[in-house]
């Protein structure tokens, strides 16, 4: 892990903390990923990609209030960040904040990502908005 390399001075190459965090997220090491993302953020403060990954890690460990705050931070620096609108929208819906969640899903769909992997997120947002329009409300978090 890059943290140990930095502490003990192993290797001459700079550590890519962002990439390290992404890899840690993939294998379910959410707390370790948070550490890597925080180190990456020190190198590039206000980086939307790093902040979004932090929000994802918070969500996965159940710290949804922190995830909401982090997504809001992303949007305060970068208002058009589609991924932050998507993540925030669904978190707000789970918290029972339907109007605000719906607004963020609509903002996500105004400028959705066009990558192949994003298609399922776009479809999920559209389906959710259709369900909301039919009066089917997601259950709030307990």
Label for each model-derived stretch:
Residues 11-46:
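Alpha-helical segment of the N-proximal tetratricopeptide repeat
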């Amino acid at each position: 892990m890059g943290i140990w390399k930095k502490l003990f001075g192993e290797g001459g190459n700079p550590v890519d903390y962002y990439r390290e965090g992404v890899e840690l997220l993939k294998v379910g090491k959410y707390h370790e990923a948070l550490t890597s993302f925080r180190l990456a953020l020190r190198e590039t403060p206000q980086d939307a990609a790093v902040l979004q990954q932090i929000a994802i890690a918070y969500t996965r460990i159940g710290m949804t209030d922190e995830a909401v705050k982090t997504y809001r931070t992303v949007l305060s620096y970068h208002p058009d960040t589609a991924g932050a609108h998507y993540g925030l929208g669904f978190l707000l819906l789970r918290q029972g904040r339907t109007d605000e969640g719906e607004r963020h899903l609509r903002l996500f769909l105004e400028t959705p990502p066009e990558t192949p992997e994003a298609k399922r997120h776009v479809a999920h947002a559209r389906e959710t908005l259709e369900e909301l329009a039919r009066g089917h409300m997601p259950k709030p978090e307990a």
